C-alpha cells in the first residue's frame, strides 16, 4: 500500500493506508524492517488487452479467473482514470518477496498522516538524500515486462 505521490481513494491516500491510517502508522512506526510497494511502483506494472487475451486463451481455471478480473478492472480503470489497463498492485508485493532483483528500491523515511483533513491516510515519504532515519525500503521501479510475463505465466501454469 501507500504511495510516494498521488493516491487512489483520495488525491493523496492509497486505499489500504486510508482504510486504517492509525494501524498503518503503528506498523510504520514499529521499527520492523519494511518494504513498501506503493502506487508509484504498481502503476508502472500494468496489464492490458494482450495479456487478458493470452490468459483467456488458456484452459486453466486460474487464467480464466485472472482474465475476468483483469477485464473488469481494466474497464474500471478506464472509467476512473482514462486508461484501459490493470495495475498489478498485489502481484508486485508478492513478487518482491520471491524475486527482489526485479525491483529497484530507495530507503526513505515514511510517516503516515492520521490527522489531516485533506491528507488523512497519506504516506509521507521523505525522498531527500539527507532524510532523517530512512526506515522503509520503497520500491521505485520494476523490470515491468518481466514482472508481467511472470504473472501471466503463473496464471497459465500455476505449477511454474
Over which residues does each language-model region extend?
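Active-site histidine-anchored catalytic micro-motif
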Residues: 1-43
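Conformational coupling and interaction surfaces
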Residues: 18, 22, 37-160
Amino acid at each position: 500500500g501507500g504511495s510516494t505521490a498521488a493516491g487512489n481513494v483520495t488525491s493523496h491516500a492509497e486505499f489500504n493506508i486510508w482504510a486504517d491510517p492509525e494501524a498503518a502508522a503503528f506498523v510504520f512506526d514499529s521499527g520492523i524492517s519494511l518494504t513498501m510497494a506503493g502506487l508509484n511502483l504498481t502503476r508502472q506494472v500494468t496489464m492490458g488487452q494482450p495479456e487478458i487475451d493470452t490468459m483467456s486463451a488458456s484452459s486453466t481455471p486460474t487464467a480464466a479467473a485472472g482474465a475476468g478480473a483483469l477485464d473488469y478492472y481494466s474497464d474500471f480503470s478506464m472509467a476512473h482514470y482514462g486508461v484501459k489497463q490493470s495495475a498489478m498492485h498485489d502481484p508486485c508485493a508478492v513478487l518482491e518477496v520471491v524475486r527482489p532483483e526485479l525491483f529497484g528500491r530507495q530507503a526513505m523515511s515514511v510517516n503516515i498522516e492520521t490527522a489531516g483533513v485533506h491528507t488523512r491516510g497519506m504516506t509521507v515519504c521523505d525522498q531527500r538524500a539527507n532524510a532523517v532515519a530512512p526506515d522503509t525500503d520503497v520500491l521505485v521501479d520494476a523490470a515491468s515486462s518481466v514482472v508481467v510475463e511472470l504473472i501471466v505465466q503463473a496464471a497459465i501454469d500455476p505449477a511454474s
